[in-house]
Amino acid sequence: MTEHKSGFVAIIGRPNVGKSTFMNRVLGHKIAIMSDKAQTTRNKIHGVMTEDDAQIIFVDTPGIHKPKHKLGDYMMKVAKNTLTEVDAVIFMVNANEEIGRGDEYIMEMLKNIKTPVFLVINKIDLVHPDQIMPIIESYEKHMHFTEAVPMSALEGLNVDHFINVLKSYMPEGPQYYPDGQISDHPEQFVVSELIREKVLHLTSEEIPHSIGVNVDRMVKQSEDRVRIEATIYVERDSQKGIVIGKGGKKLKEIGKRARIDIENLLGSKVYLDLWVKVQKDWRNKVNFIRQMGYIEDQD
């Protein structure tokens, strides 16, 4: 009988290299927020992939960046601490971007850990196949990797192969989560992330890092209907106007798009009621950040 394998795998990389896209591709559900704007993942999100012979729990870390406020400090602390708690690390980079300072900073961190580190060259659909090997070699000049794997998370290219590679490095262990469970975050947190994703997609550059979403109330009204009330927090009055839009059109579109994803997640019809409030300088208020679910209670 084949031994069952299980392990925890961290996904790390500069902002927007496709970490969340990869995890959502593997899980088949939207768990990690996806956006083309930097610093969109604010919390460790555990995505659970269960197969007959293995279970891999993915940890999607905040994008590496230089902190500018207390929330940023916390995001960096989460990313660094995660590396010491896992069985393997995926260092993901973009095939169509040269090595930057952020990549070099991450590799300096990774040199000191003892767990297997996989270099994943993502977005290979954007470059010529002849470019892939030189890209891998350029990273290998900086540090040794357990294996280097080119892929396109968005297109699904080489993803299954990489999962098989990962499984071969996982230790023997039990199934930590039951079949069908794809995240260890409460549903309210995932719902708030889906709403925040739509705000990021539909608002201008002024808004993204100032956005926080809190699910105030989530009630199952019947077997196939859920009522959700949520508040979108911004830091300035001008931002509130941008999120709401002329005649409330922008907020209505945010709600419409979020509702579709939430219904797919919950498998129920959803009534979604959204509010927009100003909470000045909220990213520097530790208690408020904790209330929003971005800081875990620590001993």
UniProtKB/Swiss-Prot annotation:
GTP binds at residues 13-20, 60-64, 122-125. Residues 13-20 are annotated as: G1. Residues 151-153 are annotated as: G5. Residues 122-125 are annotated as: G4. Signal peptide: none annotated. Keywords: Cell membrane, Cytoplasm, GTP-binding, Membrane, Nucleotide-binding, Ribosome biogenesis, RNA-binding, rRNA-binding. It holds the Pfam family MMR_HSR1. Residues 39-43 are annotated as: G2. One of its GO terms (cellular component) is cytosol. It is a peripheral membrane protein. One of its GO terms (molecular function) is GTP binding. One of its GO terms (biological process) is ribosomal small subunit assembly. Its main location: cytoplasm. Residues 5-172 form the Era-type G domain. Residues 60-63 are annotated as: G3. It is found in: Cytoplasm; Cell membrane. Belongs to the TRAFAC class TrmE-Era-EngA-EngB-Septin-like GTPase superfamily. Era GTPase family. An essential GTPase that binds both GDP and GTP, with rapid nucleotide exchange. Plays a role in 16S rRNA processing and 30S ribosomal subunit biogenesis and possibly also in cell cycle regulation and energy metabolism. Monomer. PANTHER family: GTPASE ERA, GTPASE ERA, MITOCHONDRIAL. HAMAP family: GTPase_Era. This is GTPase Era.
